[in-house]
Amino acid sequence: MDFFYIGVMSGSSLDGIDIALLKQDDRSRLLATHYIPMPEDLHAELLGLCSSGVDELARAAIAEQKWCRLVAQGVQTLLEDQNMVPAQIRAIGSHGQTIRHEPARGYSIQIGNPALLAELTEITVVSDFRRRDIAAGGQGAPLVPAFHEALFDDNKDHRAVLNIGGFSNLSLIESDRPVEGFDCGPGNVLLDAWIQSQRHESYDKDGEWAASGEVDQALLQKLLSDQFFLTKGPKSTGREVFNLGWVHHHLFQLPTLTPEDVQATLLELTALTITESLQSAQAITKELLVCGGGAHNKALMKRLAELLPDTEVSSTEKFGVDPDWVEAMAFAWLAHCCLEGVPANRPTVTGAKGRRVLGAIYPA
């Protein structure tokens, strides 16, 4: 039986909200998309909630209402563009906006007011996907490897899927064993933060600014000494660890570097932590499929190909899947799994004690 779902994803980059319409039968098919750029004031509010501050509970409650109303408007626009009505959609899978991710302390917080979203859209909402996995002893992240497995597993071995959003995570796909996956470290988060602080630009288009600089080995080695990179998976991370303050901490006591050299070094950090993670976890990788915003960073993609000479590095576009929409598709699929009672976490990815059905349901 065919079902229609809507997936909503707002990632750690805080640049915008992705809304995807999915047709789900024996496979997942992307039918339409809608993108909402994050308003500057809401971006600032959400970024502020990622670290300790004053009156956080009230600020979070207000911010999530703004976020939710934006999403509801986007869902309405998407449906109108497709000449569809809410009754045709089985559910919205809403990730919400992560403001804290501390699995070692037993919590991950996503705001988004799914009750209000169900009320505004008149569509059942499935949300709160991470906490059940954490309750079962897992990291609560990454959750997309199970979807990567469903989408890209065609019984070929030695394939990996790399998502480069604010943070980078890998899914390792082999035909004879369960999918494995983990966070590698910063994806775009430090690159975006640095160029925003130095040039007041939202991101480094094509990695051109990074390509204009030189990698500083002293800084690179200091960055690579972080405990996260020395820890074996399952593991996940977030802005609590990797942020602009973390960069400034490591720049302290180093000779003055040009801003573009810092950017080049941050790009090298992203590329190295991805390739080293991949090589240590999967002896042979014939094919690396890249999705997320980082797939458009030409300098980063070029560097990954250089570091992985025996691996074909390409965008998920090769499979006819737009790299910008894989995560939003994943949360539509996770909503489907929840309503069907299908466990969607992978203990080989998160470290949970077992398979669990993920998500909380807010009926229309």
Curated annotation (Swiss-Prot):
- Give the InterPro entries listed for this entry: Anhydro_N_Ac-Mur_kinase, ATPase_NBD
Q: Where does ATP bind?
A: G11, S12, S13, L14, D15, G16, I17, D18
What's its catalytic activity? 1,6-anhydro-N-acetyl-beta-muramate + ATP + H2O = N-acetyl-D-muramate 6-phosphate + ADP + H(+)
Enzyme Commission number(s) from the entry? 2.7.1.170
- State the Gene Ontology terms under molecular function: ATP binding; kinase activity; phosphotransferase activity, alcohol group as acceptor
* Gene3D superfamilies for this protein: 3.30.420.40
Pathway the protein takes part in: Amino-sugar metabolism; 1,6-anhydro-N-acetylmuramate degradation; Cell wall biogenesis; peptidoglycan recycling
Lineage top rank: taxon = Bacteria
Q: What is the enzyme's main class?
A: transferase
Cysteine pairs bridged by disulfides in the record: none
Which Gene Ontology BP terms does the record give?
A: 1,6-anhydro-N-acetyl-beta-muramic acid catabolic process; amino sugar metabolic process; peptidoglycan turnover
Pfam families registered for this protein in UniProt? AnmK
Q: Which UniProt keywords apply?
A: ATP-binding, Carbohydrate metabolism, Kinase, Nucleotide-binding, Transferase
* Keyword flag Nucleotide-binding: yes
Q: Which PANTHER family match?
A: ANHYDRO-N-ACETYLMURAMIC ACID KINASE (PTHR30605:SF0)
Q: Which purpose does this protein serve, as stated in its record?
A: Catalyzes the specific phosphorylation of 1,6-anhydro-N-acetylmuramic acid (anhMurNAc) with the simultaneous cleavage of the 1,6-anhydro ring, generating MurNAc-6-P. Is required for the utilization of anhMurNAc either imported from the medium or derived from its own cell wall murein, and thus plays a role in cell wall recycling.
- According to its UniProt record, which protein family does this protein belong to? Belongs to the anhydro-N-acetylmuramic acid kinase family.
Matching entries from NCBIfam families are given as:
PRK09585.1-3
**Protein name (Swiss-Prot/TrEMBL):** Anhydro-N-acetylmuramic acid kinase
